[in-house]
């Protein structure tokens, strides 16, 4: 019985020992599975990994991993690793320009300069293909895509070889024009005004009411209305015939007559205004001489009378003259065909609208070479530097800028420049 009890006790001890060993194995195995790097020091400690922007200075072994930060614009590390050191940044060479700088956690991103694209097979920058005359742009040349062109379909044309302009719609002649040349894929249609087409007028029938001029002197209308009404009456008198003017020679001979009549009307109007002002000043001077010394000046808003029978409020006359002078100053300020004559607010608006790479396309249309365009990228505001450089040229006219904007399909900027009127006439 004692031997049987001893044997059972030994078996229990053996089972307990196996159970303990199994538990220890499971615990050690679980500890190793939680190590993300899968590497351990000689003492069994899990090796730590270096974060993004850090590289391994001393690998894990006898001691724990030693990390060091990468240097901005010199080295980078874009992986979490216990073995990878910081890698040197990529340099953009030749026809490449940097679109994203090298930082501690990301490498530099290079792209081909304006007018070039990166060939996927060779990796080199190749010149963008040019759409020839009669072909237009479908997809622009950028990054890893070359220019995609198409032959201009019917109703469109392209008369320039470049890699930025699509096929343009053909010009349609108006009813008052005749077509000299049809539109082809490589040339636009050409139109010409039809000469000798005049508006015919019929004489009024007998017995109709005819307005007779009034003997009373009417109130002087504004200058622009007086000129328009006088010219309209003159043209009606000369052209008021029931027979249309058919011969071209007669129409050409009447043009000097119209010009002479218009000049006479303008001279007469100027003389009339000068006489009225001189007469008014003369009466004011006579009134000042005959007024007593202690007489107070007329209050604001008093009516001024002249021999013409016209009653004018002095305050309204002063406000109208001030408004006229202000409008004239605005007209003089806004006049001019140079880009530098634009108001500062308009130039700043153009700079804001030229976002992205649009200013590069505009620079190419204004005649700048790719090397010169790249030099603007070193400025704080490349768009402002481009427009300032171009605006200093004698040929920097507003018409040239509008034409270049139309060629790069930026009609919104053209509309913004043309929307604001320079001045308004006083009423």
UniProtKB/Swiss-Prot annotation:
Residues 32-254 are extracellular. N-glycosylated. O-glycosylated. Disulfide bonds join 35-46, 47-60, 50-67, 70-86, 89-102, 92-110, 112-125, 128-141, 131-149, 152-167, 170-183, 173-191. This is Tumor necrosis factor receptor superfamily member 16. Keywords: Apoptosis, Biological rhythms, Cell membrane, Cell projection, Cytoplasm, Developmental protein, Differentiation, Disulfide bond, Glycoprotein, Membrane, Neurogenesis, Phosphoprotein, Receptor, Repeat, Signal, Synapse, Transmembrane, Transmembrane helix. The gene is Ngfr. Residues 1-31 form the signal peptide. It comes from the Eukaryota. Residues 356-421 form the Death domain. Residues 276-427 are cytoplasmic. GO terms for molecular function: calmodulin binding; coreceptor activity; death receptor activity; nerve growth factor binding; small GTPase binding; ubiquitin protein ligase binding. Residues 200-217, 284-294, 308-329 have a biased composition (Polar residues). Residues 197-223, 284-334 are annotated as: Disordered. GO terms for biological process: axon guidance; cellular response to amyloid-beta; central nervous system development; circadian regulation of gene expression; circadian rhythm; detection of temperature stimulus; dorsal aorta development; extrinsic apoptotic signaling pathway.
